[in-house]
A protein has these predicted regions:
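Bacterial N-terminal signal peptides
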Residues: 7-18
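Boundary at the C-terminal end of the N-terminal hydrophobic targeting segment
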Residues: 20-23
Length: 263
């Protein structure tokens, strides 16, 4: 599963999706468990690489994924409720997403500027595309946590401007890892092993190196089938603060922007 969706991981900072407004003609729009759900109808004449799920079925899949989180992942729901206290939490089904130029199967992505409603409240927006609507609900639930909780909480805490992309993704992957634990997916399956390797050996590699150097007693938080995500996140906060203060994060972000990897 994870090998198919790696394309989603940097879209929230580097892509420029079509900007929707509060007047966007959603064919379906409703509030579900405090979340604003909206579906965009397929534009006439548009040809896609796969047949998108019918809007009603796509919305039902989103609700099923949300229900799974409410039943099984109070850790994730508490974070979503934090976002709800600060603004509007929006999940949009857009069958046109992603555009064909993106490689891989992009399931969902967090776009801070995808949808702008009237007023000054923050919008925490995750877009689920035509692939994501067909994804199994349990896996989709964890991807929603990655995008909405992981990247949404980063915006809530003001981290998007001073944390390197690799570290933003590390944090989002940690939230996703915790969701997989809560949902009860088989952590010894081939796909979960691939996910764990991507988490540890790619996105969180430099963070884990920092942990070994500066917090050796915390290495044990990783060394189990189900890593202690809340404990790891406490160490992570120290790590990103070190990078902010010593200027390493700013230098990396400047390079990302010069290379067009970040807005």
């Amino acid at each position: 599963m994870r090998g198919k969706v790696l394309a989603l991981v940097i879209l929230f900072v580097c892509a420029a999706p079509p900007l929707l407004s509060a007047a966007t003609p959603f064919v379906v729009q409703e509030t579900y468990r405090g979340l604003s759900l909206g579906a965009i109808g397929l534009r006439p004449g548009v040809k896609l690489d796969i047949a998108p799920l019918e809007t009603g079925k796509a919305m039902a899949r989103l609700k099923e994924a949300i229900d799974i989180l409410h039943r099984k992942s109070p850790f994730s729901i508490r974070a979503i409720e934090t976002l709800q206290s600060a603004g509007n939490v929006v999940i949009v089904y857009d069958p046109h997403f992603p555009k064909s130029r993106f490689s891989g199967l992009t399931i969902a992505a967090y776009f801070p500027e995808y949808y702008q409603a009237g007023g000054s409240s923050k919008q925490f927006v995750t877009v689920v595309g035509r692939y994501g609507a067909k994804w199994p609900a349990a896996e989709l639930a964890a991807v929603l946590v990655h995008e909405l909780v992981g990247h949404g909480m980063q915006r809530y805490r003001g981290r998007l401007e001073h944390v390197r992309t690799i570290d933003l993704e590390c944090e989002a992957y940690l939230y996703e890892e915790r969701a997989y634990q809560d949902i009860g997916l088989d952590k010894l399956s081939t796909e979960m092993i691939k996910f764990r390797r991507t988490l540890e050996d790619n996105w969180c590699k430099t963070f884990r190196m920092h942990t070994r150097r500066s917090h050796p007693s915390s290495v044990a938080l990783w060394e189990r089938l189900n890593p202690d995500v809340p404990g790891i996140l406490k160490v992570y906060l120290d790590y990103i603060e070190v990078l902010r203060k010593n200027g390493a994060a700013r230098k990396a972000i400047d390079i990302e922007r010069r290379e067009g990897l970040r807005r």
